[in-house]
Amino acid sequence: KGLNTLIASGDVYIRSEKPLQDIPEVDVVCYGLWVNPSLATHHGVFVSDRKKPEVLDFMLQKPSLEELEGLSKTHLFLMDIGIWILSDRAIEVLMKRSLKEGTNDISYYDLYSDYGLALGEHPQTTDDEVNKLSVAILPLPGGEFYHFGTSRELISSTLAIQDKVRDQRRIMHRKVKPNPAIFIQNSFTQVKLSAENANLWIENSHVGEGWKLGSRQIITGVPENHWNINLPDGVCIDIVPMGDAAFVARPYGLDDVFKGDLRNDSTTYLGNSFTQWMKEREIGLEDIKGRTDDLQAAPVFPVTTSIEELGILIRWMTAEPQLKQGKELWLRAEKLSADEISAQANLERLYAQRSAFRRDNWKGLSANYEKSVFYQLDLQDAANEFVRLNLEVPAVLKEDAAPMVRIHNRMLRARILKLQGNEGCKEEQAAFQLLR
């Protein structure tokens, strides 16, 4: 009652294996997790007096290990997992602080570093209205926190979720990946991967036999191509469709943060300083027509309608700085910043490409069921996808297939037939016969 608004952070996956506790009647309820102090230093932290662990004393943003150690004698701390429940009163105060005083103009006001630091019995900042709000801190029972805020975390968090199941008796397929940290989805790949390709993510992409991959790489959005490309370790590729027929090439480094003046040696791009990147390619700031005070806003990513030229540009920007044709294409091309790419991307083309790859993937997973996760997927979702993509119903499996796999096969066939408006009872009966 009165707690009507839930705010959840968009770059985390929260998993809980136990029922939630009762929610107290306060203005702000925040969920937290007991975590290793080193992890807490990268996030917000709720600090509570050991005598009143359910009441927020104050909040810190990315505290140091020394700060946490100093507090540990008298206080407990929980890491903020980004799930807050606010009362109507708390929302009114938040909205008021988000406007310029005396106007209806939007002002910058951060939920965590502004609003959060003014909460608690001994808040870090003074704000009379926010300071008066009552706050409760709830540990998430059996909670797990997976952060997807960086490129590296995209892989590490997915790997951690994948490794939740290690019991081989619960895994139907017999395929063993060359490295557990290899993830390929909605893609067509023709390269042979090995244990050296650790921390590799390929999504919505065509990676042909002319590619040579390394480790610590994320490849997204690459259209069908015939490129010969040698991608260095730690170098990622993102191709984004623009307009009706163009693409923009956005290579980047796995740990690039996309901020900083282009003149500063501390501004990194593709794992090196941006100044060094320009020097190796014999270009200067005068060749960048636009902002150079911040990498996120600098127009350095070329646009082209030619798939062949797209590959040449990628090679020049990543591994072949002396590729003359690449430099000429880059200098002539219209170029966009990372901000402009986000604003102008043609998402319909992006999703259409993904759907085409996904359609082929469904067929491959079904045909290669012995070495894929196909029959351990959500069969309801799989049936919906087969009907949506107008795919043929999977054939009845042979008798030498594992009994449980054959049961799943029959039930999937039954569900697809029903969704198509056909009779699926015989398939259901066959599944139940296999249970006997």
Can you annotate each of these PLM segments?
Residues 340, 399, 404-406:
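Residues that mark the junctions of alpha-helical repeat units in TPR/alpha-solenoid scaffolds
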Residues 348, 372, 380, 429-435:
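TPR/TPR-like (Sel1-like) alpha-helical repeat modules
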